[in-house]
Curated annotation (Swiss-Prot):
Species: Kluyveromyces lactis (strain ATCC 8585 / CBS 2359 / DSM 70799 / NBRC 1267 / NRRL Y-1140 / WM37)
Protein name: Iron-sulfur clusters transporter ATM1, mitochondrial
Primary role: Performs an essential function in the generation of cytoplasmic iron-sulfur proteins by mediating the ATP-dependent export of Fe/S cluster precursors synthesized by NFS1 and other mitochondrial proteins. Hydrolyzes ATP. Binds glutathione and may function by transporting a glutathione-conjugated iron-sulfur compound.
Sequence ranges assigned to domain ABC transmembrane type-1 in this UniProt record: 130-421
Family: Belongs to the ABC transporter superfamily. ABCB family. Heavy Metal importer (TC 3.A.1.210) subfamily.
Residues in the Mitochondrial matrix compartment per record: 37-129, 200-248, 295-360, 417-720
Amino acid sequence: MIMFRSLSVTPVWKAGLSLSHRSIPINSRLSSVRNYISIGCANKTGSRLLRSAGVSSQYKDFRRFNSSSNGNGTDKNASVAPKTEVKKIVPPKPSTNGKSKTPTISELRIMKDLFKYIWPSGDNKVKIRVLIALALLIGAKLLNVQVPFFFKQTIDSMNIEWGPDVATVLPVAITMTILSYGAARFGAVMFGELRNAVFAKVAQNAIRKVSLQTFQHLMKLDLGWHLSRQTGGLTRAMDRGTKGISYVLSAMVFHMIPITFEISVVCGILTYQFGSSFAAMTFVTMLLYSFFTFKTTAWRTEFRRSANRADNKAASVALDSLINFEAVKYFNNEEYLANKYHQSLSKYRDSQIKVAQSLAFLNAGQNFIFTSALTAMMYMGASGVMEGALTVGDLVLINQLVFQLSVPLNFLGSVYRELKQSLIDMESLFKLQKNPILIKNTERPLMLPEHLPCEIKFENVTFGYQPDRNILKNATFTIAPGKKTAIVGPSGSGKSTILRLVFRFYDPQQGRILLDGKDIRELDLDELRRIVGVVPQDTPLFNDTIWENVKFGRINATDNEIVTAIEKAQLSDLIHKLPKGTETIVGERGLMISGGEKQRLAIARVLLKDTPIMFFDEATSALDTHTEQSLLKTIKENFSDVAKTSVYIAHRLRTIADADKIIVLENGAVREEGTHNALLANPNSLYSELWNIQENLDMLEDELEDELKLEKEPRTSKKD
């Protein structure tokens, strides 16, 4: 039998509704009281809520009653707590530059990381494709270099005196030369296109593997890492990084290697055909052109990095604003967020303007170098023709060979610029893969205990999300197998942290968590998480159908098992009312359904998962009383099996009064533990204090509801 400890304070409650607070609407006072009940602890926040309800005198009298040494409602012997100095909160200083302090990855390291995807160990099919693509590349460039030679031969062949005795039909030799010219040009293009087709599969496979491995790595990172990152920035970094891989691969195979090969061939031909002076001029031009391009591009790189940072920030602001659309509307902060988004876009605009201006400078410098060299070589060639050392065809050949380099050289500038940009984008992607996995299996993980459910034991566990602020402090307690255990306490005492530690979202800094005597850090991580089910306070749902969200509890479940879980969670009524039934989209984070329906969906998920250990993390605290009672009934019907260990983290003590064991936390340590009756039997226990506060607030809630009804009655009679 549950014992309800009553207090002789009813007159105080009635007297507390003083005339000075009658001006406060009853609905407002009732809402404040209900909010305080949901807090479930006697703290300063609750005191403010009560004052807003106009019942601060009751709260003070009740506190005096509970804190008195003799328990008779007086506070003569009550000790007065010393006043503590209130520290002022200092607003954060605005960022002055916004530059990232994170270390960069060298370009050589990035290329090395990428190379293993295009030349994978043990995958001969991919290697053969790469070799075929390189062979086609070389063939295309050799044919491309032959084009100016056929053009030269055609011009020299036609350098004859045409008269009436000369046949009107071109000689066969000239015809063959022209046809060879066309065939070489067509062959070079076809070889290039075949190279693209052969290498496309290699490039796309590399992109797929990098994206998949990055995603899998992100899924293995700890919860703390994800909570400290902005989702919008992460998705943008992955998107740009994969595009960067695509460009780097195409640039290397389709541009950088071909350009280098073609320049080498042209320099060799010029040296062999016309002497070292033409080759030296070409070589010096290439050096100057490349040096200017690389130096200028390196200078422009920081502008691009700055643009990326601003782009990430803008994406994060936009995504956060859209995800929290309701909150934006509640507080009328559309203009504030628009200004915030505008600031990020302005920084992106400024960086992009610098990128465009520096690009104009780069293009002008490149054209000046190349045009100067081409003019000088044309002068040298024309001089050779006038001296008789060269033919007109030779002059055309020199012009064609050098001018033919202008196309790849122009590509060299743009390719190098984009290559640097792509490497920056890939740097962000590969950085994600370099983040260390803190929560992982040991080299030889142990098997789970044979008998489930098993005992969960915390041994001197100390843990904090921040190094200088511990949430749990040397906590020691035991959760018995097959029993209902409740964990209660004031906000911030570490209740939800216990769930996160058992699930191994984090590892404790000190102490151990044991399952039947085995440290959970030594158990297989996937197996551990497979036997723990969670119904959280705010159920995370995907923007998908009800059916798919329930199925997420166990992907390989049969249709009958999913239907059974839906029926047990009492979702059938909702589904029958919806036009599309189980195919109804729940919306982003489940915003298209009510809080109670979201929790029932969460219950259906864990029913489908069917785990021997269950955690209910304040699963009903955000719901109204009627919905809460209905859900508690559903939970009791489905999770009362002795083969399951149920752990309830709760603020509302009425919901866990029937627990086999109640653990009371305060300031990160176990204050007391026992059954509901045993804890209430001790008038000085924290649990007794919390219980009495909530019980008397329930009384006040009932009185305010009655007063609200009386207030409505005269209005009804007047209408009649």
